[in-house]
A protein has these predicted regions:
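Conserved catalytic alpha/beta core of Sir2/sirtuin-type deacylases, generalized to analogous enzyme cores
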Residues: 1-215
């Protein structure tokens, strides 16, 4: 390769020459894809929580000690939906997949937003070590099981007044103020032991590593 080649040129050539590629991906890749956790996107969905509780980004809100489970799940249902069930605003993951098409590849990621799967990467070549926004687990694990949450999260959002579009967009009818709590009957409980459930995210030693995690 010519000495004056750019880093992008060298990367392109390295990818072309490689028989196999290992991809390591963290939060920066999803940020590049438009999953901003602060600023306008945060204000669009969480301005009411910001005003009441004083945190200024989604990540900080995820650790806030909400006074009730009803409020906690109102917050988390919005958080989960826009970062897991809505498509990324920019096609960064699709572009990455095109770069490695036809090659052997393996992905190791700490991201929990399911973007690799939504971009049609082979799940068998993917290890997402920190969990998935789309899964729930027992808060005091009585078993190593996780449970898909799309249906219950949708119900939580609709109970707050949101309308979910065919493209998974969230909107509120004119004159409606979103509620900041869900009905108590929508709080998820473990089907095995009855304890409250939580997200399947690695934040402490209660993280459940289910069968899919170990494959």
């Amino acid at each position: 390769m010519k000495s004056g080649s750019t880093p992008v040129d060298r990367l392109r050539q390295a990818l072309s020459d490689a028989d196999a590629v290992v991809i390591g991906a963290g939060a920066g890749l999803s940020t590049a894809a438009g999953y901003a956790y602060s600023g306008e996107r945060f204000a669009r969905y969480f301005s009411d929580f910001e005003k009441k509780y004083g945190f200024h980004d989604m990540y900080s809100g995820g650790f806030y000690p909400f006074p009730t489970e009803e409020e906690r799940w109102a917050y988390w249902s919005r958080y989960i939906w826009i970062n897991r069930y809505q498509n990324a605003p920019k096609p960064v993951y699709d572009d990455l997949r095109k770069l490695v098409e036809g090659k052997g590849y393996f992905i190791l990621t700490t991201n929990v937003d399911h973007c690799f799967q939504k971009a049609a990467f082979d799940k068998k070549r993917l290890f997402y070590t920190q969990g998935d926004y789309g899964l729930l687990q027992c808060s005091q694990p009585c078993c190593q099981e996780t449970y898909e949450n799309e249906v219950i999260v949708r119900q939580m959002l609709e109970s707050q007044g949101y309308v979910i579009g065919e493209d998974s967009s969230l909107s509120v009818p004119e004159g409606v103020t979103p509620k900041m709590a869900i009905p108590s009957e929508l709080i998820p409980h473990c089907p095995v032991c009855g304890r409250p459930m939580t997200m399947n995210l690695r934040c402490d030693d209660t993280f459940v590593e289910d069968e899919g995690w170990h494959r």
